[in-house]
Amino acid sequence: MKLSPVFTSIALALTCSSTSVLAKDFIPIETFPEWFKTAMSRSIDVTKESDFSLASVAAKGKVKGEISLVDESEGTWYYHIDIGTPTPVECYVFNEYDGPANSLHAIVDLSLNGAAELNGKTRSAQFNYAIDTGVIGNTPYLQLDTLYHLGEGEEKVAGMIKAYSAQTNDTLEICVHNELGYRDIFFDVFSSFVNTFNSEPADAPFFESVYEMRINDIPMGFAVEKYTKDADGDVMIESETALLVPVDANTVSRTDSADISWSRPDGSLINGSTYTIDNGVLSSEFEISVADDKWHVEGQIQGKAVSADLAHDGWLLSDFGSYLETADLIKRDAESAQFKMWTPDADPVSAISITLSKVTGNEDANMKIDMGPMVLDFYAEDNGIFKHGVMAQGPINIFMKSIYTQG
């Protein structure tokens, strides 16, 4: 399994201490006046469907509501979907983007500015209302709902931007709805829109997994892994992570990362590359490969160039190899095994020592990974596939759970 999301989650959890007291809906509905409760309970049954296609990205299918193209530019398409409410659902398609977390936040901010301009009032306050994650078929999504106030005093008005994002193949879909209530139908419309982009890629992965990630009881995002073999039997590993973590009542920290690496059939690393975007800024990017019989790393972190040889010049375990070694240890009489891995989120210029051990007496875990001061307890099936795990850091627990597996 990919360890980078675990390190990233820990770093975010330790810096965003307020998350320990939050929940999925951060503001209890009971604290609002009756008119707000009534508005939030609104629903509508949308039976109409419309045909949708976008040939340039091979999208085609039925969308709930009546969809129409409003605007397009190079690599961007903007649609309205009429669902019978005063405000239409707005959907964007991008083929260039920062990621599901950063781009979702940017579109929400754009929508908040648009609401202020439309009403001729300044944005006077905003609050994180809800964050969630899940899957539509095999496609993970993020949810970010934002309660906002415009104006001051007796002129103050309230509203809510509901928003979802999902990445499908080479495009990112984001939908927003500036209406109180209608939460269920908005998700149904978004799901139908996303499903039109879910065509099977030419080189389908032989294994794919999506993990939900939580801090205590707070949904914070997802991690995706895809494994594809080439003609020589080598394995390409594609992994992506998208995280939204509340910093306080008004703001969220955003992280998107993407990795591509190659593994030999025996689980040894060939090479790899990774990048991370934090809060709209490319915070790091690295590549690792063998040069002159040494592992060499090139890249940058916070704009500072990095070029170094690892002190370790031996075998490195790939993410694919971690599955193989887990399955092997489960079958053997041995209690533990040690490896070296390149985990740039922990240290980009070092090979991290990993100890994989069996766990007994714990109904929720049969294995654990020791990474220095951090320990991940997890449950793996006999074939090595990770099902769920937890890492404790003081009062904070980082949970990972498989919510989709294929292969």
State each model region's role:
Residues 38-77, 219-299, 384:
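N-terminal mature ectodomain segment of secretory-pathway/periplasmic proteins
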Residues 1-22:
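Gram-negative bacterial Sec-dependent N-terminal signal peptides
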Residues 70-160, 166-177:
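Conserved polar/disulfide-associated segments of primarily extracytoplasmic proteins
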Residues 22-29, 207:
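Cleaved targeting-peptide boundary
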Residues 83-124, 188-189, 201-212, 218-220, ...:
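Solvent-exposed helix/loop surface patches that form functional interfaces
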Residues 377-381, 385-396:
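Short, exposed beta-strand-loop hairpins at the edges of beta-sheets
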Residues 57, 169-205, 401-407:
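Surface-exposed amphipathic alpha-helical segments
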Residues 145-149, 210, 238-245:
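Generic short beta-strand segments
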